[in-house]
């Protein structure tokens, strides 16, 4: 009888751990979905050769930057941070 109670307790703990893992994944998926929406909130374009971070040899540089909550996209590089409504985001430029 004692063995059955111990096995039942172990089973309940395992099920609870699995449920927490599923909840974490669901929360993470929701966060990623929301950050995907946030990624397109602000686009900044720079043109000209006066910006030292965007200088090229003798030609006008052009960059498009996005304030992102997650990682920068494939062809973008991290160029700093930006602040919107008191929240900090990554400034990703290409």
From Swiss-Prot:
<keyword id="KW-0044">Antibiotic</keyword>
<keyword id="KW-0968">Cytoplasmic vesicle</keyword>
<dbReference type="GO" id="GO:0050832">
    <property type="term" value="P:defense response to fungus"/>
</dbReference>
<dbReference type="GO" id="GO:0002227">
    <property type="term" value="P:innate immune response in mucosa"/>
</dbReference>
<keyword id="KW-0211">Defensin</keyword>
<keyword id="KW-0929">Antimicrobial</keyword>
<dbReference type="GO" id="GO:0050829">
    <property type="term" value="P:defense response to Gram-negative bacterium"/>
</dbReference>
<dbReference type="InterPro" id="IPR016327">
    <property type="entry name" value="Alpha-defensin"/>
</dbReference>
<dbReference type="GO" id="GO:0005796">
    <property type="term" value="C:Golgi lumen"/>
</dbReference>
<feature type="disulfide bond">
    <location>
        <begin position="72"/>
        <end position="92"/>
    </location>
</feature>
<dbReference type="GO" id="GO:0019731">
    <property type="term" value="P:antibacterial humoral response"/>
</dbReference>
<dbReference type="GO" id="GO:0031640">
    <property type="term" value="P:killing of cells of another organism"/>
</dbReference>
<comment type="similarity">
    <text>Belongs to the alpha-defensin family.</text>
</comment>
<comment type="function">
    <text>(Microbial infection) Acts as a target for S.flexneri infection by binding to the bacterium, possibly via bacterial surface proteins, and thereby augmenting infectivity via enhanced bacterial adhesion and invasion of epithelial cells and tissues.</text>
</comment>
<dbReference type="GO" id="GO:0071222">
    <property type="term" value="P:cellular response to lipopolysaccharide"/>
</dbReference>
<dbReference type="GO" id="GO:0032757">
    <property type="term" value="P:positive regulation of interleukin-8 production"/>
</dbReference>
<keyword id="KW-0325">Glycoprotein</keyword>
<keyword id="KW-1015">Disulfide bond</keyword>
<dbReference type="Pfam" id="PF00323">
    <property type="entry name" value="Defensin_1"/>
</dbReference>
<keyword id="KW-0732">Signal</keyword>
<dbReference type="GO" id="GO:0045087">
    <property type="term" value="P:innate immune response"/>
</dbReference>
<protein>
    <recommendedName>
        <fullName>Defensin alpha 5</fullName>
    </recommendedName>
</protein>
<feature type="signal peptide">
    <location>
        <begin position="1"/>
        <end position="19"/>
    </location>
</feature>
<dbReference type="GO" id="GO:0061844">
    <property type="term" value="P:antimicrobial humoral immune response mediated by antimicrobial peptide"/>
</dbReference>
<keyword id="KW-0399">Innate immunity</keyword>
<comment type="function">
    <text>Host-defense peptide that maintains sterility in the urogenital system. Has antimicrobial activity against a wide range of bacteria, including Gram-negative E.coli, P.aeruginosa and S.typhimurium, and Gram-positive E.aerogenes, S.aureus, B.cereus, E.faecium and L.monocytogenes. Confers resistance to intestinal infection by S.typhimurium. Exhibits antimicrobial activity against enteric commensal bacteria such as B.adolescentis, L.acidophilus, B.breve, L.fermentum, B.longum and S.thermophilus. Binds to bacterial membranes and causes membrane disintegration.</text>
</comment>
<dbReference type="GO" id="GO:0034774">
    <property type="term" value="C:secretory granule lumen"/>
</dbReference>
<dbReference type="GO" id="GO:1905710">
    <property type="term" value="P:positive regulation of membrane permeability"/>
</dbReference>
<comment type="subunit">
    <text>Homodimer. Homotetramer. Interacts with B.antracis lef/lethal factor.</text>
</comment>
<dbReference type="GO" id="GO:0043231">
    <property type="term" value="C:intracellular membrane-bounded organelle"/>
</dbReference>
<dbReference type="GO" id="GO:0050830">
    <property type="term" value="P:defense response to Gram-positive bacterium"/>
</dbReference>
<dbReference type="GO" id="GO:0005615">
    <property type="term" value="C:extracellular space"/>
</dbReference>
<dbReference type="GO" id="GO:0042803">
    <property type="term" value="F:protein homodimerization activity"/>
</dbReference>
<dbReference type="GO" id="GO:0030133">
    <property type="term" value="C:transport vesicle"/>
</dbReference>
<dbReference type="GO" id="GO:0030496">
    <property type="term" value="C:midbody"/>
</dbReference>
<keyword id="KW-0295">Fungicide</keyword>
<dbReference type="GO" id="GO:0051289">
    <property type="term" value="P:protein homotetramerization"/>
</dbReference>
<feature type="disulfide bond">
    <location>
        <begin position="65"/>
        <end position="93"/>
    </location>
</feature>
<dbReference type="InterPro" id="IPR006081">
    <property type="entry name" value="Alpha-defensin_C"/>
</dbReference>
<keyword id="KW-0964">Secreted</keyword>
<dbReference type="GO" id="GO:0051673">
    <property type="term" value="P:disruption of plasma membrane integrity in another organism"/>
</dbReference>
<dbReference type="InterPro" id="IPR002366">
    <property type="entry name" value="Alpha-defensin_N"/>
</dbReference>
């Amino acid at each position: 009888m004692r063995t059955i109670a111990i096995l039942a307790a172990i089973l309940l703990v395992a099920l609870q751990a699995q449920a927490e893992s599923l909840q974490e994944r669901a929360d993470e998926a929701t966060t990623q979905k929301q950050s995907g929406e946030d990624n397109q909130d602000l686009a900044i374009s720079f043109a000209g050769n006066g910006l030292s971070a965007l200088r090229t040899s003798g030609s006008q540089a052009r960059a498009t930057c996005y304030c992102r909550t997650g990682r920068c996209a494939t062809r973008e590089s991290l160029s700093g941070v930006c602040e919107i409504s008191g929240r900090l985001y990554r400034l990703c430029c290409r």
